Amino acid sequence: MSDLRRKGWWNVPDYFYSPLVFDMEEDQEDYIFGPDDEYLHTLEVHSNTLIQLERWFSPTGQTRVTVVGPLKARLWVMDMIRKVGSKNTLDKIKGKLMLLHIRSHPLTDQDLQIHLISGSSCWFPD
């Protein structure tokens, strides 16, 4: 991931094709990104992604979330968000730990590899 930061991942057009797009409840958005999106920039920098939040996108008041960037990083962010909002206690705890980690440390290649090995429903060969 440090190579991506040095080379500027945003200069790679492939990272902008097929963005991850999903809707999120307002309270979950505030929990993850903070009041007034206080943690949004930190999450973007630490995950090498660009995250766009469109509030009140749906009639139910949900926020439309669009994530672009390297595929493994996008999937990591989406899985963290999914786990934070999970009703399963173990997933919720894992999601909160992932959230605390990304708020304080940039993701490393090892973080992404461990994540893909330890319970993600996606697998990518090297």
From Swiss-Prot:
GO molecular function: identical protein binding; RNA binding
Disulfide bonds, paired cysteine numbers: none
Name the record gives this protein: KH homology domain-containing protein 1B
Domain of life per record: Eukaryota
Gene Ontology CC, one term: cytoplasm
KH domain residues: 19-78
Family, similarity comment: Belongs to the KHDC1 family.
Annotated InterPro entries: KH_dom_type_1_sf, MOEP19_KH-like
PANTHER family in the cross-refs: DEVELOPMENT PLURPOTENCY-ASSOCIATED PROTEIN 1/5 FAMILY MEMBER, KH HOMOLOGY DOMAIN-CONTAINING PROTEIN 1
Keywords: RNA-binding
